Curated annotation (Swiss-Prot):
The keyword Ribonucleoprotein does not apply. It comes from Mannheimia succiniciproducens (strain KCTC 0769BP / MBEL55E). Pathway: Carbohydrate degradation; glycolysis; pyruvate from D-glyceraldehyde 3-phosphate: step 2/5. GO terms for biological process: gluconeogenesis; glycolytic process. Its main location: cytoplasm. This is Phosphoglycerate kinase. Belongs to the phosphoglycerate kinase family. Monomer. Substrate binds at residues 21-23, 36, 59-62, 112, 145.
Length: 389
């Protein structure tokens, strides 16, 4: 990956425009999950240590361009950074210039409020670029989108580089996908085969073993001819599931946990996969299946994990994902390289307290999947172009 890295630049006195991913959940004006902010803090500290004048921005939620609403503001992120000890303030009208003092961080208000952001309007890209001496792309989570704050600004800024977080993401994903230690295992969960089909296809060519979970696994169970009751599955994709199962080693659950309603306190019944009734839905894998998968996980040398194997948010349907999480942590402790990505996966990692037991946790959802699919990420492509003149 030939991009300029922020870590290699002399930044003393330079105006830095950092595009971070601070798109965090907010409730009643407070940040409710701080993983993305925590991941960005080392970049901010490094920029300050190097003597830069630091501006940082991000999108938050899905605001209407050109319309400011208080709930779309990055103010809760500013409050969080203040509490973390930073000298920080919010700038709302910054497109015609903003004063930045040494030692402070200026958070530029939600980029998605700016007209032309999503369409990558060149005029907006030029305005962002005019604010800085160096543009730092550090938002892997939006690297798959060519927008004014991820692509346009990189075209026009005097220098465009990759921040530490983006560089680490690309290195870790490269390690897992380009030269994996064997055997390589990929775990893909989620509700639909259709949304992960290209990912499953790509991984079936790289991985020695695939594990599918969640609604995806239900389609594979149905492909084996079993009744899945009211479970979420995709009948039209059964032929695809059969094709993938024939091409790659994909174990299908032998036992499952079912419920008759989708609710937090729904009672769970464990049974053989052959015994699912018409009024039941599969919400988790059973103990035997979890044990089998844990064995497979513990023998892997590279593990790529995207998605849970059950509705782990509900206590009665949590066990399968918990067993798998702990098996990944154990394999990692024994020398495997593990990389995890995707919102649900990160929530599971938090819930089961294994954050420090995974080799690398990706902050990207869609970008993580597109990289796995082998797609070019526009925001990375422009950094490569700029690095190579």
């Amino acid at each position: 990956m030939s991009v300029i890295k922020m870590t290699d630049l002399d930044l003393a006195g330079k105006r830095l425009f950092i595009r971070a991913d601070l798109n965090v959940p907010v409730k009643d004006g407070k940040v409710t999950s701080d993983a993305r902010i925590r991941a960005t803090i080392p970049t901010l500290k490094l920029a300050l240590e190097k003597g830069a004048k630091v501006m940082v921005t991000s999108h938050l939620g899905r605001p209407t361009e050109g319309e400011f609403k208080p709930e779309d503001s990055l103010q809760p992120v500013v409050d969080y950074l203040k509490d973390a000890g930073f000298n920080v303030r919010l700038a709302q009208n910054y497109l015609d210039g903003v004063e930045v003092n040494e030692g402070e961080i200026v958070v530029l208000e939600n980029v998605r409020i700016n007209k032309g952001e999503k369409k990558n309007d060149p005029e907006l890209g030029k305005k962002y670029a005019a604010l800085c001496d160096v543009f730092v792309m550090d938002a892997f989570g939006t690297a798959h989108r060519a927008q004014a704050s991820t692509y346009g600004v990189a075209e026009y800024a005097p220098v465009a580089c990759a921040g530490p977080l983006l560089a680490a993401e690309l290195d870790a994903l490269g390690k897992a996908l380009k030269e994996p230690q064997r055997p390589m295992l990929a775990i893909v969960g989620g509700s639909k085969v259709s949304t992960k089909l290209t990912v499953l296809d790509s991984l079936s060519k790289i991985a020695d073993q695939l594990i599918v979970g969640g609604g995806i696994a239900n389609t594979f169970i149905a492909a084996e001819g079993h009744n899945v009751g009211k479970s979420l599955y995709e009948e039209d994709l059964i032929p695809e599931a059969k094709r993938l199962a024939a091409a790659t080693n994909i174990p299908v659950p032998v036992d499952v946990r079912v419920g008759t309603e989708f609710s937090e306190n729904a009672p769970a019944t464990e049974k053989s996969v052959t015994e699912v009734q018409a009024d039941e839905s599969i919400f988790d894998i059973g103990d035997k299946s979890a044990e089998e998968l844990a064995k497979i996980i513990k023998s892997a040398k590279t593990i790529l994990w995207n998605g849970p194997v059950g509705v782990f948010e509900f206590p009665n349907f949590r066990k399968g994902t918990e067993v798998i999480s702990n098996a990944i942590a154990e394999a990692t402790a024994n020398g495997a390289f593990s990389i995890a990505g995707g919102g649900d996966t990160l929530a599971a990692i938090d819930l089961f307290g294994i954050k420090d037991k995974i080799s690398y946790i990706s902050t990207g959802g869609g970008a993580f999947l597109e990289f796995v699919e082998g797609k070019v990420l526009p925001a990375v492509e422009i950094l490569e172009k700029r690095a190579n003149g």
